[in-house]
């Protein structure tokens, strides 16, 4: 609800040819199939794709983490894995931001649109944090 509306507003405001790639890491229910890609596709002319393992990130595309997966980026490609901790103990945003900072360095920025809890805040304490806006 709040997160979905924030994503829709964000993508409606962007030009589809910005040259940037967007990777979304919302907290999705692992027991249900997600239709987030279909919903967001109505808000942008960019392709909105459910992330696949080993897919190279391309400009002007939106990638969405699939339910019940962890995601990292290594050498510009998304890496998916099955979580090894219970759902309430996962921090998928922190994990992705850490890998993004290591892989892309100064070429990356994180935008936290909405949410509750602390997932996504650990990056602020890292040695090499990403610029974050939208808190």
Cite the ranges covered by each PLM segment:
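Conserved acid/base catalytic micro-environments in cytosolic active-site loops
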Residues: 1-135
């Amino acid at each position: 609800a709040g997160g979905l509306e924030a994503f829709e507003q964000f993508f409606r405001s962007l030009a589809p040819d910005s040259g940037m790639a967007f990777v979304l890491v919302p907290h999705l229910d692992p027991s249900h199939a997600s239709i987030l890609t279909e919903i967001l596709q109505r808000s942008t002319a960019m392709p909105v794709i459910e992330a696949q393992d080993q897919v190279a990130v391309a400009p002007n595309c939106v990638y969405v983490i699939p339910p019940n997966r962890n995601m990292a980026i290594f050498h510009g490609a998304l890496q998916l894995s099955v979580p090894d901790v219970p759902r309430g103990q996962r921090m998928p945003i922190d994990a992705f931001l850490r890998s993004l900072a290591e892989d892309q360095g100064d070429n990356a920025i994180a935008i936290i649109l909405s949410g509750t809890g602390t997932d996504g805040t650990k990056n602020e304490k890292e040695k090499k944090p990403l610029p974050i806006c939208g808190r």
